[in-house]
Protein backbone atom coordinates (compact mmCIF):
# COMPACT_ATOMS: atom_id res chain seq x y z
CA UNK A 1 0.00 0.00 0.00
CA UNK A 2 1.32 3.45 -0.90
CA UNK A 3 1.10 6.21 1.66
CA UNK A 4 2.45 9.74 2.02
CA UNK A 5 3.82 11.12 5.27
CA UNK A 6 3.39 14.90 5.36
CA UNK A 7 4.92 17.47 7.70
CA UNK A 8 4.43 21.23 7.75
CA UNK A 9 5.78 24.26 9.56
CA UNK A 10 3.73 27.43 9.86
CA UNK A 11 3.91 31.09 10.89
CA UNK A 12 1.72 30.25 13.91
CA UNK A 13 -1.04 27.94 15.05
CA UNK A 14 -4.35 29.60 14.19
CA UNK A 15 -5.73 29.95 10.67
CA UNK A 16 -8.23 32.39 12.21
CA UNK A 17 -5.27 34.67 12.92
CA UNK A 18 -4.12 34.39 9.31
CA UNK A 19 -1.19 32.06 9.92
CA UNK A 20 0.20 30.28 6.89
CA UNK A 21 2.41 27.36 5.89
CA UNK A 22 6.14 28.08 5.49
CA UNK A 23 7.44 24.55 4.82
CA UNK A 24 6.02 21.34 3.37
CA UNK A 25 7.87 18.05 3.51
CA UNK A 26 6.53 14.72 2.23
CA UNK A 27 7.91 11.24 1.75
CA UNK A 28 6.23 8.37 -0.02
CA UNK A 29 6.03 4.97 1.67
CA UNK A 30 5.35 1.66 -0.03
CA UNK A 31 4.26 -0.98 2.50
CA UNK A 32 5.71 1.25 5.24
CA UNK A 33 9.13 1.39 3.50
CA UNK A 34 10.30 4.84 2.34
CA UNK A 35 10.66 5.13 -1.42
CA UNK A 36 12.94 7.67 -3.05
CA UNK A 37 9.96 9.91 -3.87
CA UNK A 38 10.02 13.08 -1.79
CA UNK A 39 8.56 16.56 -1.97
CA UNK A 40 10.02 19.49 -0.06
CA UNK A 41 9.68 23.25 -0.28
CA UNK A 42 9.93 26.39 1.79
CA UNK A 43 7.21 28.98 1.20
CA UNK A 44 6.96 32.74 1.45
CA UNK A 45 3.93 33.28 3.70
CA UNK A 46 3.64 37.00 2.88
CA UNK A 47 3.32 37.73 6.60
CA UNK A 48 5.52 37.79 9.67
CA UNK A 49 6.48 34.58 11.46
CA UNK A 50 5.29 34.63 15.08
CA UNK A 51 7.91 34.53 17.83
CA UNK A 52 6.55 31.20 19.10
CA UNK A 53 6.78 29.61 15.63
CA UNK A 54 10.29 31.02 15.14
CA UNK A 55 11.35 29.28 18.36
CA UNK A 56 10.04 25.97 16.98
CA UNK A 57 11.41 25.98 13.42
CA UNK A 58 13.92 28.85 13.27
CA UNK A 59 12.80 30.14 9.85
CA UNK A 60 13.16 33.90 9.83
CA UNK A 61 11.17 36.37 7.76
CA UNK A 62 14.40 37.16 5.90
CA UNK A 63 15.04 33.47 5.06
CA UNK A 64 11.48 33.02 3.74
CA UNK A 65 11.30 36.31 1.82
CA UNK A 66 12.72 34.96 -1.46
CA UNK A 67 10.83 31.64 -1.44
CA UNK A 68 7.92 30.80 -3.73
CA UNK A 69 4.34 31.40 -2.66
CA UNK A 70 2.04 28.38 -2.21
CA UNK A 71 0.15 29.10 -5.45
CA UNK A 72 3.42 28.60 -7.34
CA UNK A 73 3.98 25.08 -5.96
CA UNK A 74 0.38 23.94 -5.44
CA UNK A 75 0.12 21.90 -8.66
CA UNK A 76 3.42 20.09 -8.02
CA UNK A 77 2.41 19.41 -4.40
CA UNK A 78 -1.04 18.09 -5.36
CA UNK A 79 0.49 15.87 -8.05
CA UNK A 80 2.81 14.38 -5.42
CA UNK A 81 0.13 13.59 -2.89
Predicted region positions:
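Conserved non-catalytic scaffold segment of RNase H-like nuclease domains
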Residues: 1-81
